[in-house]
Amino acid sequence: MAREGHEVILLEKNSSLGGRARQLVRDGFRFDMGPTFYWMPDLIERFFADFGQKPQDHFTLRRLDPSYEIVFAEGNRIALPAGEQAVTALFEEIEPGSGKFLRKFLRSAEFNYRTAVEKVIQKPGRSPLELVMPETIVRLPQFVRSVAHTIRRGVKDVRLRRVLEFPALFLGARPEQTPSFYRLMNYADMGLGTWHIEGGMAQLVAAMERLARTLGVEILPDHPVRKILVEGNHVRGEATDRGRF
């Protein structure tokens, strides 16, 4: 909106921006207090590209290898390597034949990811009918079957099942209740990889804040909004502890 010439004021409840992506700095150490995984880097790239910039203009990104390590209740561990080829080799080593399933699964996951990113998330989210399009109609069974059902049909090793079900847990959902279409997150995980921002996730927040300020956005911390002022069907302003805007 600021880029289009509108006056924009951002009212922030806390003393700093970021919300859950805040950072604790103590004794020379920095701790991410919320999100730690930098997934789906292409979406962040698109955001900065809208303003003629790149994420690397603001912070240093490093792809993690291994991406992460899963520790099971029995004490077993699986360190997930970076890159589809390496992950496929790991699956094949643990369960011969599972690599073939994984390759097919990830190609389907990539298609779902591209569909979601390029066509679905651009919609306003006002109706479930926004999901109806040729790309989703042909995948209707994936909306009525769970991702756990699909994974457990293709992989027998319990540990590998848990690895493939992890992205659903990452979304805060149960794999048994998550539509199989959301296998798209497996592509985000194994295809696009897990990245780390040098200095922590707060660097992304700081980059967005700098960008907003360069566009003329006025940012007011310590301004909790108490009420949205509505007249008729129109929002006329917001009431805070420090005045009305």
Model regions and ranges:
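N-terminal glycine-rich phosphate/pyrophosphate-binding loop and immediately adjacent elements
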Residues: M1-R114
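General beta-strand structural signal in soluble alpha/beta enzymes
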Residues: L11, R162-L164, L220-P221, T240
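Active-site-adjacent bridging/hinge elements
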Residues: L11-N14, P179-R183
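Flexible loop/turn segments at secondary-structure boundaries
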Residues: L17-G19, L171-G172, K227-L229
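Glycine-centered tight beta-turn/hairpin loop motif at sheet-sheet or coil-to-beta transitions
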Residues: A73-G75, T240-G243
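Rossmann-like flavin
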Residues: A73-P179
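Helical element adjacent to the flavin cofactor pocket in flavoenzyme catalytic cores
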Residues: L184-D241
